[in-house]
A protein has these predicted regions:
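An N-terminal-biased, well-structured beta-alpha scaffold segment characteristic
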Residues: 1-104
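Glycine/serine-rich phosphate-binding loop and adjoining beta1-alpha1 elements at the start
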Residues: 5, 76-184
Length: 185
């Protein structure tokens, strides 16, 4: 498994934690993790879990049998894709650039395992938005509400290092508000 660095600006998420990588290593998988200038999780955890560390954006030169794992879109170019890729490809519902991505897989002989279509035996989606996506969405909603109380717009929100950093920032915003919080978000 080759965990690639995300190329999309402001994308700090990663689909595999160091603990998950350690579990895969213990099960006999070889795990390579690319360096990343924007990933929220430090590379040291992956090193400590026994992962091989590769330079950022080295996945095109990964061994043929590597399964490339990422979350969001690949860089837009015409390079044929020869590997198996696990990601949210945004390619099968008429999304922008979907046809071009599929042509790249066809040209290179690679395969796209689109997480949007990963389902269990009953057809239930397995890679749907989880607890933390909802948690972050609620926090951002509260930040927007707090800004609106001062007739301003909520500014850009950068990635937080962890839940406590998010909560500290949110508490700071809410401390400026009257003791009359919203009843619904």
């Amino acid at each position: 498994l080759w965990v690639r660095a995300e190329q999309r600006p402001n994308e700090a998420r990663v689909g595999l934690t160091p603990a998950g990588a350690k579990t895969l290593k213990q099960a006999g998988f070889q795990v390579t993790v690319e360096q990343s200038t924007q990933r929220a999780i430090d590379l040291e955890g992956y090193s400590a879990s026994g992962c091989t560390i590769a330079p950022e954006n080295a996945w095109p030169d990964a061994p043929d049998d590597a399964v490339i794992f990422g979350l969001k879109e690949l860089p837009k170019d015409e390079t044929p894709l020869r590997h198996r890729h696990i990601m949210f490809g945004h390619a099968f519902k008429g999304q922008h650039d979907g046809k071009a991505l599929l042509r790249r897989f066809q040209a290179g002989g690679g395969t796209l395992y689109d997480l949007e279509y990963l389902v269990d035996d009953t057809g239930r989606r397995l890679a749907a938005f989880g607890y933390w996506a909802g948690y972050a969405g609620a926090a951002v909603s509260l930040k927007c509400w707090a800004a609106q109380q001062h007739n301003t717009l909520c500014g850009a929100i950068a990635a937080y290092t962890d839940k406590n950093a998010l909560l500290a920032d949110l508490h700071k915003d809410l401390a400026k508000e009257p003791a009359n919080p919203p009843r619904a978000i």
